[in-house]
């Protein structure tokens, strides 16, 4: 049983905490918050030991009537690994100023740059490379989703060139500061977007073969990808079969009512998923087509949750708890109640 500390109990951190708590080979020894908000109070109510991420703010929790066990410095030495859930760019600062100082292994999230850590993690592609490493970046929700679909395609044919258009949600449901509300925004307006190079940080053999562009649209539910991949040779049946065999990919049919991201989220609600999380990515089966060995398909990504099981697998890899990535994936999925 390994000790996991969650530094930053926010959108990602609280989900990772719940996922880790469901595993039988790891436990959450504490979570941190920078301010005494409702998430901090709920963390305590759920039984997590709460620590102030910033020592100077400990008194704010006490004044708000939220019990804290101490500060980050009081618990970090007990951790075998820290999962950093801090906002973008803060993770790198935490790595340099906290984790390396205390000699504790750490997982950064996708908001940090590839060069900030020793490697970039995806359960299917880079588990072996990250095995036993000290500081790893777990790639973003979009990159995680693309890595899964590229894995499926690569299992039946060589990828010669990949072109992906990402239609990104404007904000998470709880975000009142981000937009747009009434616009479609190229993000970035230049091509390629950062997503292609990010995929390459996980899958080096796609260097020079992947091109991505991205726009932001006024929705909060999910991202969507329109994928076009030139291959050495395949057919639709092979791709459908590969998607079905690849972990954490669901193939859903518009003919059965899955005709929008809203319906996919409704499905997740009906599954009884906490926070309506869909840790699996969803590929529309009708969108899968192969013309002259070029694969076309569309997939949806729940931006708040597809990286969560990857964090659990990354813990096992870095702490050398399981050498077989597929066994770790299976163990994580079973504990979290994933479909596949």
Swiss-Prot record:
It holds the Pfam family DapB_N. One of its GO terms (biological process) is lysine biosynthetic process via diaminopimelate. This is Glyceraldehyde-3-phosphate dehydrogenase. It catalyses: D-glyceraldehyde 3-phosphate + phosphate + NADP(+) = (2R)-3-phospho-glyceroyl phosphate + NADPH + H(+); D-glyceraldehyde 3-phosphate + phosphate + NAD(+) = (2R)-3-phospho-glyceroyl phosphate + NADH + H(+). D-glyceraldehyde 3-phosphate binds at residues 140-142, 195-196. GO terms for molecular function: 4-hydroxy-tetrahydrodipicolinate reductase; glyceraldehyde-3-phosphate dehydrogenase (NAD+) (phosphorylating) activity; glyceraldehyde-3-phosphate dehydrogenase (NADP+) (phosphorylating) activity; NAD binding; NADP binding. Its EC number is 1.2.1.59. Signal peptide: none annotated. Belongs to the glyceraldehyde-3-phosphate dehydrogenase family.
